[in-house]
Design a protein with these regions (language model features):
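Short conserved beta-strand and strand-loop elements enriched in small hydrophobics
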Residues: 49, 87-88
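Intrinsically disordered, low-complexity Pro/Gly/Ser/Thr-rich segments with frequent PxxP/GP/PP motifs
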Residues: 53-86
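A generic structural signal for short beta-strands and their flanking turns/coil linkers
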Residues: 27-32, 44-46, 83-85
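C-terminal interaction-tip segments
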Residues: 1-29, 33, 90-113
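Short solvent-exposed strand-capping/beta-turn motif centered on an Asx-Ser/Thr pair
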Residues: 36-41, 92
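Short edge-strand/loop segments of extracellular domains
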Residues: 52-55, 106-108
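Beta-strand signatures of extracellular beta-sandwich domains
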Residues: 47-51, 100-102
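Short beta-strand segments
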Residues: 19, 44, 58-62, 72, ...
Length: 113
């Protein structure tokens, strides 16, 4: 199978930077949705970063507010990721946020001559 839909989920039980998804070798990925829900009733913030294959860090969302008992879709357009890139998330408060990413993994076709 060349392409497959997957999802990755994390319960942010700490305030540590947490890997949500890493693009596998020889693949690309399109993140179609990035949902964040707050379940503690107090509201929180989330930071989302993309780390490229060279280790450079790019902030996608910095201290994005998530309302009390709310679910927020962070992406307004798909996010294209390349091989070995990493999507990381970090909560301002432990045990308040859940994150779900819906992803299309793409296996490039082999070209023969």
């Amino acid at each position: 199978m060349a392409n497959s839909f997957i999802n990755k989920k994390v319960d942010l039980t700490t305030t540590d930077l947490t890997t949500l998804y890493t693009v596998p070798s020889f693949k690309a990925a399109v993140v179609k949705s990035l949902l964040v829900s707050e379940d503690a009733g107090s509201g929180s913030t989330i930071t989302v970063t993309l780390v490229n294959s060279s280790g450079a860090i790019f902030n996608l969302f910095k201290d994005k507010s998530i309302g009390s008992k709310a679910t927020t879709e962070l992406l307004t357009n798909p996010l294209v990721m390349e091989e070995s890139e990493i999507l990381k998330v970090q909560a301002a408060d432990a045990n308040e946020l859940h994150v779900i990413a819906s992803i299309l993994e793409i296996q490039p076709r082999e070209v023969t001559t």
